[in-house]
Amino acid sequence: MLDAGADARAGDPDADADAAVARFVVITGGPGSGKSTLIDALEARGYARSHEAGRGVIQDQMAIGGHALPWCDRAAFAELMLGWEMRSHHLARRAHGPVFFDRGVPDVIGYLKLSALPVPAHLVAAAERFRYRRDVFIAPPWPEIYAQDTERKQDYAEAVRTWDAMVDTYAACGYRLIELPRASVDERCRFVLDAVTAEA
């Protein structure tokens, strides 16, 4: 969830939508592409951020012996990710300045499409209602840094397919994609901040 130091605000998520959306910066991409490492670095520079829904849900489900996991029940896993993303969106309204999202609602659509599962109407509605800054940063597949772990079980080929799915999904949702350079974390931070502050 979001580390903004505030509880969610009750009310209509459309309130102050234009001002909020301009601050909500999504960084997406395939697994193992350095996306979360970049967001960690932005957080260290004082920016608000959200945590990746997929990892959070997996950690919670494994802790309680749940089955809403990508290797058990992908549809249930997607529903929990959607709830996480919507909650993060609400929480972000209390932050000041840019908020960096480790994925967004469209990622859940991309995940279901990648899994050859139907995309329910309520998920499409969520993608229309919970919007982000139009320019979305996407981390390209990067084989030299890709690594699996206990929560990331995908192989590199699936990481590439995930990238493709996110490119298609974000474009279909009306976003403009900006590819991150395969560069150091500091260089990526400068790239993102230069782009975001240039439009501020």
Annotated model-derived regions:
Residues 78-131, 146:
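Glycine-rich phosphate-binding loop used to anchor ATP phosphates in small-molecule kinases
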Residues 34:
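Conserved glycine(s) of the Walker
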Residues 1-23:
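Extreme N-terminal, non-catalytic leader segments
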